[in-house]
């Protein structure tokens, strides 16, 4: 599935969203927010303040206390945008006994449009075209994450950093319009971090996709993001230009 090419239509729209367990004391209140194609938004702030819960809410896995979440024109969670949203959670959800390639193929299958460019072709030809495109996406994503030599290895034999690269490759193979990533750069050495960040950033910019990333390291967040949102008890952090504070219940 290809990313949208219309830069004037937001990929993500949040309106009056509050998350938490009690409507009277929400964990996080989010101002109205629109994320457009090509934008990378980082969310930073202290641990335990709702960053991951906010990401899960955008993914449609958690209902907000109030407000609405719209992804690619679909109101969540009632109408999830199948294939358009890629999610890299902290708990990666990889199939540990299966190979790197198998796990990345799962992402490619999730994003495949079986009609796509082959509308005029016969059904067997269409399926062959889809299969070839899916394989190409998997191979490319594995190469971008520098996992080619590990493609046949089972996940359980990989290091934590390598597993995070597999999860990232799985999402890139899906080719979503919106990527949600929760601390996806953790456990990576500096050299690997740089190459992973470059691959993901290139995908977002070249495909006109969008990305929301949770990152505890503010310096790293500033390095990757076009905009930085800070969860910090509703106070705007003055040394970060152009940020918008999210109101958080202490």
What are these regions (language model features)?
Residues 179-182:
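Catalytic Walker B motif of ABC-type/P-loop ATPase nucleotide-binding domains
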Residues 67-83:
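Conserved ABC transporter NBD signature motif
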Residues 59:
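Helix-to-loop junction immediately C-terminal to a conserved catalytic motif
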Residues 154-158:
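Conserved ABC ATPase signature
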Residues 117-150:
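Conserved ABC ATPase "signature" region
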Residues 215-216:
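H-loop/switch region of ABC-family ATPase nucleotide-binding domains
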Residues 168:
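Hydrophobic anchor residue at the start of the ABC signature
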């Amino acid at each position: 599935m290809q990313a949208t090419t219309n830069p004037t239509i937001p990929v993500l729209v949040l309106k009056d969203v509050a998350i938490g367990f009690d409507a009277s004391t929400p964990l996080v209140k989010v101002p109205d927010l629109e994320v457009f194609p090509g934008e990378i938004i980082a969310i930073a702030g202290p641990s335990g303040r709702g960053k991951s819960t906010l990401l899960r809410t955008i993914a449609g896995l958690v209902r907000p206390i109030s407000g609405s979440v719209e992804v690619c024109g679909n109101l969540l969670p009632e109408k999830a945008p199948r294939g358009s949203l890629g999610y890299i959670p902290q708990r990666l959800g990889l199939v540990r006994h299966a190979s790197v390639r198998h796990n990345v193929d799962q992402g490619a299958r999730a994003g495949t449009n079986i009609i796509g460019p082959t509308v005029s072709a016969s059904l067997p030809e269409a399926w062959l075209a889809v299969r070839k495109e899916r394989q190409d996406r998997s191979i490319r994503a594995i190469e971008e994450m520098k996992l080619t030599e590990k493609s046949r290895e089972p996940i359980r034999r990989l290091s934590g950093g390598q597993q995070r690269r597999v999860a990232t490759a799985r999402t890139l193979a899906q080719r979503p319009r919106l990527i949600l990533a929760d601390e996806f750069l953790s456990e990576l050495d500096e050299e690997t971090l740089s190459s992973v960040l470059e691959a993901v950033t290139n995908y977002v910019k070249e495909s006109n996709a969008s990305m929301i990333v949770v990152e505890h390291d503010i310096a790293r967040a500033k390095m990757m993001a076009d905009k930085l949102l800070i969860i910090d008890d509703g106070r705007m952090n003055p040394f970060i230009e152009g940020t918008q504070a999210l109101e958080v219940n202490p």
